[in-house]
């Protein structure tokens, strides 16, 4: 019985441990069974009662047990929690934080791109997706949000006033009331036309109702003619058609990546990594220099290749619009601000020939679209306090009008504008002259360009452009798949490698030695040619002329001593350039005319007297006129002083320009006569071969020498503007200078118009020749604006909405946009065995007048991108460009061309 002795419990034996253990386990099992049968509340009460009975040591034991068993699990909550909880957590993040969270891991990226997170953020701003994503597609709303945010329009004060009415400027009339009145007048006119048409049709009764009782009442006293009725109907139709065309233009997107109208590009890596960075100091330190290059610049590929590494450069076509040019700049800068912007385009000392139809000058600088362009351009460059500046590679600093343009642009944008003074004459030599207001201790050209390459380009611009026309034609088939900027740089590098002129420019001693050697060789060749021809001694004639020019050279040195007087420097440049020009004309007389006349007088005629008269009569008269002008300048400048005048001499010269008019009128006949004589007279061919492109002729041929009269007037105009710029307002010469400038400017416009007409005619002939079945394109004032290659699509079912339509590619088209019509042609490609390049052929399809062309944009969807509709009176084309930029640029240019054609 001793073994069953108990203590503190009637059920637990004290001394028998095995029995004690057995009984304890049975009772624990019994309590556990009861615990399992209890409810949750009963279990909680039981645990509470047990813990109240426990001592501190027992409670500490429970705490230690929980701390050992309950270890903290370091796992990603998005992989453990249900998806709806994770999405609920992510819904509290901002769009910027969601983009940053997407870079953490793939589960986070998948969750943060769900449409349920991004759709409310888009709908909040009214950015609706143009199509419904499929079940297995995600991220569409995120891409839509990013596209809308990254391409938000920055409104200038003028645009904000037009949109929201926030610009407090006095208005002459209520715009809304004016628009309402205009619509009312249009509706009234349409209804009047319709009523008149019904009335006229009612009066013109058919013959079978002439015997009715009411025929005598309805029969008018004067029957209207059928042509009158037709004219009324045509007038009504034209008014409605014009309104319809204008409405279609207004519905086109005016910005790239507008919500629901364009594709939604993914963020670039730079933007992804920069989501959480917002350091203005770092962005200021990394601001790039930006260079804008016009395709109108001769040999622009070599200018592209001259751009320094690290400078962002863009080549734009001269035919684009201001809106398209801003888009190209915005895309190239990619949200950054440029430290400086350089604009390398065509122009003169008064205006910038920035785009086709936009010569920026004092007269049109404040036009709304031009002003908005410069305001937005100024927002892309750093402020003047931060060292930002805009550099025009156009000699605006050489005239009062150009300086006024720079001043107005600075006031308009708050940015510093600078340009070369243009003292150095010649083809684009002004970029090497002094710059107006340069504050950086060096010319702005050294900021953007490798100066040795740029100097090479500027020295041989005219020759390089002629050469590059052939190079482009030969290399384009190989580079047509590349971007234009890349292919342009490759062609420019090819030209520099072929020329090999950079090392010569860097080594002046070598260049001088080479020039001396070539001069000695030319003297020997000239003497040998004289012996063979037994004709005119060219060298002796030139040596006599050198005596006359020694006095001019001494006079130039005297004027050069007064370097502080800017007016004297410009006059010296006028005298020096005129001397060089007369030398060029005397080369024609001494090298070509004199030997031909000597051969004719010695009964060994190379050309007949009639042909010599046709080819050289006008150029010799020009030589006589300019020789007299040079003598007058020399006599006036023998004792030059601040009070002396040159305007009177130039005015007298400008009143005798009929000599030049005769030359330009006969210019085509002169060139054709040279070509005919070269082909038909072997002796003349040999004569030209012996004298063309020698050192005596400055490596020029006879047709190239005849180009100089047309180019001289641009130099006259720039120099006269520079003289007037540095002439005080009270000076006696100022009035004569203004008269002379007007004379030269008017005559230069006449030359430019002739040149433009010939160029347009040749260009239209080339297009007509390459398009099979093309009608006659040559018309007055017609010119080509742009050529765009597109794919023609066919819609399988036009009854469904745009977002669900399926398209198939059926043809390749080329669209030739003229200023008055659109020519549509099919484009075919043919390959030759064993050849990599292909041949492109064009087949005429149709032409549509621009004022009858309707345009409709097709929003991007999963099935089609960059598409639009062109519809004429008889045809309809669904077109698509290969890239988004081409569509935006094409629609912008087309819209501008249609508006211009309807305003005529």
From Swiss-Prot:
GO molecular function annotation = guanyl-nucleotide exchange factor activity
Q: Secreted: is it a keyword of this entry?
A: no
Domain DH, chain residue ranges per copy: 566-754
Q: Keyword Transmembrane: yes or no?
A: no
| Swiss-Prot/TrEMBL keywords | Guanine-nucleotide releasing factor
- Identify the residues that the record assigns to the F-box domain, covering every copy: 75-121
Which InterPro entries does the record associate with it? Answer: DBL_dom_sf, DH_dom, DUF4347, F-box-like_dom_sf, F-box_dom, GEF_Ubiquitin-Prot_Reg, PH-like_dom_sf
Query: Which PROSITE patterns does the UniProt record give?
Result: DH_2
Q: Which domain of life is it from?
A: Eukaryota
Q: What does this protein do?
A: May act as a guanine nucleotide exchange factor (GEF).
The protein's matches in PANTHER family, at most eight in alphabetical order, are given as: EPITHELIAL CELL-TRANSFORMING SEQUENCE 2 ONCOGENE-LIKE
* Designated name of the protein: Epithelial cell-transforming sequence 2 oncogene-like
Gene name as annotated: ECT2L
């Amino acid at each position: 019985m001793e073994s069953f002795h108990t203590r503190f419990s009637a059920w637990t034996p004290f001394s028998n441990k095995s029995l004690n253990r057995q009984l304890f386990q049975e009772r624990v099992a019994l309590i556990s069974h009861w615990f399992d049968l209890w409810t949750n509340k009963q279990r909680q009460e039981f645990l509470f009662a047990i813990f109240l009975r426990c001592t501190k040591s027992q409670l500490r034991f429970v705490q230690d047990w929980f701390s050992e068993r309950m270890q903290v699990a370091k796992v990603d909550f998005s992989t453990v929690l249900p998806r709806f909880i994770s999405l609920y957590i992510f819904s509290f993040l901002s769009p910027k934080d969601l983009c940053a969270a997407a870079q953490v891991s793939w589960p986070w990226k998948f969750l943060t791109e769900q449409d349920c997170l991004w759709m409310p953020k888009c709908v909040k701003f009214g950015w609706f997706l143009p199509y419904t994503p499929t079940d297995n597609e995600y991220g569409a709303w995120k891409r839509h949000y990013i596209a809308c945010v990254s391409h938000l329009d920055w409104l200038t004060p003028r645009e904000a006033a037009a949109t929201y009415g926030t610009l407090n400027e006095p208005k002459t009339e209520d715009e809304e009331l004016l628009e309402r009145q205009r619509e009312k007048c249009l509706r009234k006119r349409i209804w009047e036309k319709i009523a008149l048409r019904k009335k006229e049709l009612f009066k013109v009764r058919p013959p079978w109702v002439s015997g009715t009782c009411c025929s005598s009442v309805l029969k008018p006293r004067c029957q209207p003619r059928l042509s009158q009725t037709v004219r009324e109907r045509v007038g009504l139709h034209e008014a409605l058609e014009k309104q319809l065309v204008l409405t279609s233009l207004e519905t086109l997107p005016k910005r790239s990546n507008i919500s629901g109208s364009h594709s939604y590009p993914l963020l670039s890596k730079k933007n992804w990594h920069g989501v959480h960075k917002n350091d203005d100091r770092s962005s200021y330190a990394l601001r790039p220099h930006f260079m804008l290059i016009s395709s109108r610049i001769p040999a622009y590929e070599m200018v592209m290749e001259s751009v320094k590494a690290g400078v962002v450069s863009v080549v734009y076509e001269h035919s684009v619009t201001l809106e398209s040019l801003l888009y190209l700049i915005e895309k190239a800068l990619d949200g950054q601000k440029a430290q400086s912007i350089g604009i390398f385009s065509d122009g003169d000392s008064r205006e910038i020939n920035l785009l086709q139809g936009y010569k920026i000058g004092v007269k049109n600088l404040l036009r709304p679209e031009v002003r908005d362009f410069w305001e937005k351009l100024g927002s892309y460059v750093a402020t003047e306090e931060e060292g930002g500046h805009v550099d025009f590679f156009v000699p605006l600093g050489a005239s009062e009008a150009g300086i006024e343009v720079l001043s107005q642009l600075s006031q308009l944008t708050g940015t510093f504008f600078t340009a070369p003074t243009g003292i150095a004459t010649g083809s684009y030599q002004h970029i090497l002259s002094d710059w107006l207001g340069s504050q950086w201790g060096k010319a702005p050209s050294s900021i953007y360009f490798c100066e040795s390459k740029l100097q090479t380009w500027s020295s041989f611009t005219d020759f390089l452009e002629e050469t590059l026309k052939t190079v482009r034609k030969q290399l384009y088939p190989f580079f047509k798949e590349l971007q234009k900027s890349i292919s342009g740089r490759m062609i420019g590098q090819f030209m520099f490698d072929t020329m090999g002129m950079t090392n010569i420019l860097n080594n002046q001693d070598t260049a001088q030695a080479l020039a001396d050697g070539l001069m000695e060789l030319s003297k020997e060749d000239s003497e040998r040619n004289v012996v063979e021809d037994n004709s005119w001694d060219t060298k002796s004639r030139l040596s006599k002329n050198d005596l006359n020019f020694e006095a001019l050279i001494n006079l130039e040195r005297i004027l050069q001593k007064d370097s502080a007087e800017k007016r004297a420097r410009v006059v010296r440049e006028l005298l020096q350039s005129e001397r060089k020009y007369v030398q060029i004309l005397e080369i024609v007389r001494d090298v070509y005319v004199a030997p031909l006349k000597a051969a004719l007088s010695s009964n060994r005629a190379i050309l007949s007297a009639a042909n010599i008269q046709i080819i050289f009569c006008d150029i010799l008269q020009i030589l006589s006129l300019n020789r007299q002008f040079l003598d007058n300048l020399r006599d006036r400048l023998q004792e030059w002083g601040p009070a002396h005048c040159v305007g009177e001499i130039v005015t007298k010269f400008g009143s005798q320009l009929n000599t030049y008019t005769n030359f330009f009128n006969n210019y085509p006949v002169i060139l054709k006569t040279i070509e005919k004589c070269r082909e038909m007279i072997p002796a003349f061919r040999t004569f030209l071969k012996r004298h063309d492109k020698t050192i005596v002729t400055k490596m020029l041929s006879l047709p190239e020498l005849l180009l100089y009269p047309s180019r001289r007037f641009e130099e006259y105009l720039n120099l006269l503007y520079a003289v007037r710029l540095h002439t005080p307002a009270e000076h006696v010469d100022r009035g004569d200078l203004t008269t002379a400038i007007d004379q030269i400017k008017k005559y230069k416009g006449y030359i430019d118009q002739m040149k433009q007409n010939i160029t347009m005619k040749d260009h239209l002939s080339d297009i007509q020749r390459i398009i099979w079945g093309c009608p006659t394109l040559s018309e007055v004032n017609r010119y080509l604006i742009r050529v765009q290659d597109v794919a023609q699509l066919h819609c399988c079912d036009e009854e469904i909405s745009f977002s669900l339509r399926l398209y198939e590619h059926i043809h390749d088209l080329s669209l030739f946009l003229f200023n008055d019509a659109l020519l549509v042609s099919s484009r075919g490609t043919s390959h030759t065995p064993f050849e990599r390049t292909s041949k492109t052929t064009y087949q005429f399809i149709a032409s549509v007048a621009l004022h009858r062309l309707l345009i409709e944009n097709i929003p991007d969807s999963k099935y089609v991108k960059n598409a639009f509709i062109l519809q004429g009176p008889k045809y309809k084309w669904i077109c698509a460009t290969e890239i988004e930029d081409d569509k935006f640029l094409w629609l912008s240019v087309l819209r501008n061309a249609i508006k211009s054609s309807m305003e005529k």
